[in-house]
Design a protein with these regions (language model features):
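N-terminal presequence-like segments and the immediate start of the first folded domain
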Residues: 5-10, 18-77, 81-94, 99-149
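N-terminal secretory signal peptides that target proteins for export/translocation
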Residues: 1-2
Length: 149
């Protein structure tokens, strides 16, 4: 009986240790005061990538561009860069959550969004939000799972 418990505990410890070693943290280069932000752009655990919330900021001003369409493009480019930095593609994205300060921008966002996928789209939510960081209109986060070769 004690041997079974000991073996069970040993297997549990080994599986936890193996899982911890299987993480890759994705942090894209950041400028200015963005360098010290306390989060990763994505975390790859096994074949699953957890994509942190991305906002679309102009690299020169650190603020969202005047155009909602341009901001949507910057957000989606940030998502794409994180996904590709982990060795995955946008076709591996299985779930997306979009937070938006103006639900009237639904069609504007969709016009940009759909250009990033080929074929089937990820599961998705488009959620209204009162305010977002740095005055952004959109924040996007998601999950990608690497397909078997």
């Amino acid at each position: 009986m004690k041997l079974r418990i000991l073996v069970g505990v040993l297997l549990l410890v080994c599986s936890v240790a193996a899982g911890a070693a299987d993480r890759k943290y994705i942090v894209k280069p950041r400028a200015g005061d963005m360098k010290a932000l306390p989060f990763s752009d994505g975390v790859l655990v096994g074949n699953t990538l957890y994509i942190a919330g991305h906002i679309g900021l102009d690299s020169k001003t650190g603020m969202p561009p005047a155009s909602a369409e341009d901001e949507a493009g910057l957000v989606m480019e940030g998502i794409k860069q994180t996904v590709e930095s982990a060795g995955l593609s946008m076709d591996d994205v299985v779930s997306i959550q979009i937070f938006c300060t103006d639900l009237k921008l639904y069609d504007t966002f969709n016009g940009v969004y759909k250009t990033y996928f080929h074929g089937d789209y990820p599961a998705r939510a488009f959620v209204g939000a009162s305010t977002l960081l740095r005055g952004g209109r959109y924040e996007v986060m998601g999950i990608a799972i690497k397909r078997a070769p």
